């Protein structure tokens, strides 16, 4: 290929410059989903036409200072292919061009720039209905994509946070019931050098959302909006040192984390958990059944050690250096998405069974989390996953995979138990050559009715 023609031949498109494009540093992950650009008044989508592949890009961060005028808090939505992708006769025909801006949804009162969005398909028809994203002011927003036209797509604040608790990663979404969800996210930043020494208390939040109303009614329903921390149930973390024998029957000790299990009352709009000093969340949580696995990082730096100072006082040509080291740890915390609390035998969990205990009023509680040294990440491996559908059982449309035909979902997916049989090896595969076995409830035959037979 002619190198001079690279910019014209290789990229599918380049976003237009100008007043409608004030993107900052977009360090987040763009999302791709199918959207309807012409919906009915009740918010429903016709699947045979007016469906497009859209790219969702957060505005990012233009300046480190959160209140800087250069920081715009907005969600950009772009036409990806410039073709109709509905199921009707117009499928594949030209419809605009790649890179056209379908919408730019500016968040009023946004702080510090928008972070990576999460896309949600509530009815599993293959069309995205909502997006959720947070800003560096600690606020979480809901973007309703069900209006008649993209120009009418709206954003409302569902949680009011604090600039001391920035949201720099995408939220997870847990499907609690029919069009009832928990939006789960953590706070904290590891973007700027100043973040390294920041010890402000960060938190994990779960905000309840009921999305069963038409667009205008939902926008007017204040019970789903502007929730504050005082409206949430607080859960707490306890660290316990456990003694056990390893596979070689050698005595070992390890620290396990347990969450409280405070009851959610009708007045609560969700839950929250405060983290320890220096801990923060900068990665999207992973949903496994009804358990949210949150990755927590902690950075501890020493004051530095000056080398060569005495020699330099005698000889000005001798170099002086300052060595500073940082120790990192990673905690994986499994959280009951419904109340932010304890895990039982029916919950998806990854901690060894030796770390279980009895909790008053709850029964057998399995440890919620473990801590390891270093920067550790994981991939969830399930041998019984039969498809590469990018839409999860919760409706999160941000996974990798191959889209199904529109409307070809097989009903509401199961997110309460694993398919397969006892003994199947599910695991969190870690990047440090370790793995953690994942256990939980296995789906099986159940009695749904009975009657007595007389002979």
Question: What does each model-identified segment do?
Answer:
Residues 1-455:
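Beta-propeller fold recognition
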């Amino acid at each position: 290929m002619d190198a001079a023609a690279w910019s014209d031949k290789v990229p599918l498109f380049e976003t237009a410059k100008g007043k409608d494009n004030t993107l900052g540093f977009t360090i987040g992950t763009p999302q791709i989903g199918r959207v309807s650009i012409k919906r009915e008044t009740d918010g429903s989508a016709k699947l045979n036409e007016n469906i497009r592949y859209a790219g969702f890009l957060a505005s990012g961060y233009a300046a480190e200072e959160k209140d800087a005028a250069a920081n715009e808090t907005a969600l950009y939505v772009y036409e990806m292919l410039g073709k109709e992708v509905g199921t009707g006769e117009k499928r594949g025909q030209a419809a605009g061009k790649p890179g056209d801006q379908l919408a730019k949804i500016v968040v009023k009162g946004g702080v510090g720039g928008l972070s990576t969005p999460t896309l949600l398909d509530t009815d599993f028809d293959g069309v995205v209905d909502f997006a959720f994203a947070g800003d560096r002011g600690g606020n979480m927003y809901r973007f309703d994509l069900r209006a008649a036209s993209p120009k009418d797509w709206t954003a409302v604040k569902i949680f009011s946070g604090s600039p001391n608790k920035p949201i720099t990663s995408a939220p997870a979404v847990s499907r609690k019931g029919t069009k009832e969800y928990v939006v789960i996210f953590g706070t904290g930043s590891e973007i700027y050098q100043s973040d390294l020494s920041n010890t402000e208390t960060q938190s994990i939040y779960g905000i309840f959302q009921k999305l069963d109303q038409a667009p205008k009614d939902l926008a007017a329903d204040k019970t789903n909006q502007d929730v504050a921390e005082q409206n949430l149930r607080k859960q707490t973390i306890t660290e316990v040192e456990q003694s056990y024998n390893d596979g070689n029957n050698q005595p070992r000790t390890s620290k396990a984390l347990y969450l409280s299990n405070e009851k959610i009352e009708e007045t609560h709009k969700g839950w929250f958990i405060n983290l320890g000093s220096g801990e923060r969340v900068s990665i999207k949580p992973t949903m496994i059944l009804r358990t949210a696995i949150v990755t927590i990082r902690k950075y501890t730096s020493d004051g530095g050690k000056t080398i060569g100072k005495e020699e330099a006082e005698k000889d000005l040509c001798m170099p002086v250096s300052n060595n500073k080291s940082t120790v990192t740890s990673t905690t994986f915390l499994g959280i009951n998405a419904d109340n932010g609390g304890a895990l039982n035998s029916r919950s998806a969990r990854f901690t060894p069974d030796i770390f279980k205990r009895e909790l008053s009023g709850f029964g057998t509680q399995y440890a919620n989390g473990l801590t390891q040294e270093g920067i550790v990440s994981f991939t969830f491996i399930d041998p019984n996953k039969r498809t590469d559908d990018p839409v999860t059982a919760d409706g999160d449309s941000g996974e990798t995979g191959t889209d199904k035909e529109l409307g070809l979902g097989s009903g509401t997916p199961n997110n309460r138990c694993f398919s397969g049989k006892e003994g199947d090896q599910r695991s969190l595969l870690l990047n440090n050559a370790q793995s953690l076995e994942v256990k939980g409830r296995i789906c099986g035959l159940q009695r749904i009715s009975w009657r007595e037979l007389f002979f």
